[in-house]
From Swiss-Prot:
Protein name per the record: Decapping nuclease RAI1
Provenance organism: Emericella nidulans (strain FGSC A4 / ATCC 38163 / CBS 112.46 / NRRL 194 / M139)
Main location: nucleus
GO CC terms, sorted: cytosol; Las1 complex; nucleus; RNA polymerase II termination complex
Cofactor(s) in the UniProt record: a divalent metal cation
Catalysis performed (reactions): a 5'-end NAD(+)-phospho-ribonucleoside in mRNA + H2O = a 5'-end phospho-ribonucleoside in mRNA + NAD(+) + H(+); a 5'-end (N(7)-methyl 5'-triphosphoguanosine)-ribonucleoside-ribonucleotide in mRNA + H2O = a (N(7)-methyl 5'-triphosphoguanosine)-nucleoside + a 5'-end phospho-ribonucleoside in mRNA + H(+); a 5'-end triphospho-ribonucleoside in mRNA + H2O = a 5'-end phospho-ribonucleoside in mRNA + diphosphate + H(+)
GO MF, one annotated term: RNA NAD+-cap (NAD+-forming) hydrolase activity
Gene: rai1
Amino acid sequence: MNRETFDIQPIGRFYGSNTAIRRPREIACFSYDDQHKFHLGDSSLRYYYPPQLPADLNRGFDTFQKLDDAADEHIDALLDTIAAMEKETGKRCEADIITWRGMMTKILTAPFDDMNGFEMNATCFQGTMCKQLQRQQRMPPGMASQDLMAYWGYKFETISVLDKTWDEASREEIEGRENLVVNNNAQYCSVVRTGIGRTKLVLGGEVDAIWDSKPERKEDPINWVELKTSAEIRKDWDMVKFERKLLKFWAQSFLLGVPKIVVGFRDQGGILRRLEELETANIPNRVRKSGRGTWDGNICINFAATFLEWLKSVIKEGGTWRLRKAEKSSVIEVYQVEESGTGDILSQAFLSWRSTT
């Protein structure tokens, strides 16, 4: 069995150089509706409008319509959207890697995320590597407090968005958001073309809301907003924990080209107390100036560029591969699982479409 390893440590070797970054640009989009059914287009796009404060994030927990994530969707929706775009434009979507934003977030944050591990499956087809998360063993339902804290985040999103621009929304729609049933089945997903170093990427990922509206020119950046919740900062240790959370906040938004993050700070009882707007591009400098050294954005980018270049040299056409980083490990393993085929990574519909082009 072919097996290669990549050492994350020492991360000092990724310090200093300036990796070229291709600004993420949306090339397509798709939506899931309230029943989590797939649709091409932006039907689930939502518009940011700040909530009234204070707000009780516990409200409506007993009526929460929670997404059933037992079904493993692979990257089917992403591939279906790419195929539809190719049919419309008559051009093949060229990329070195096609994957979800979440997969790239794990790679980008790996130099400073010692505790968490990951497993991904990958295959190379027509010169493009496609990656998806290896389905983990399902954990038993969390304690009530864990489930409730997860709900707080969805509640914050619900009371912070509108399904139309604020000037088109009625006062009742704006003020009645706290009474809405929280449903996390509906999602708007952006598909972007970007690049890190010499690796061309096409990434798909959920976007919470837009600040204003989409520009008429597709080339222009979109004012996306990412919505996050965090505990109030009361002492130094709280700030350290928050800066560590900022690593993931930054990575997720950086990869999709989301320029602004709105953080809702809540108390221990789940009451939303204040909002803070963060510019994604300024977060690494903010963390660097704090002097705590919890993470460095340049090291993350340089590491990702080096790792992806190495990965392209390892995973060749044909067969399926596994990328694995064990918990508390500083080594990423890459090994071949099957010598031929694409496993269940690529849908039959996508394979059939590409075989005709």
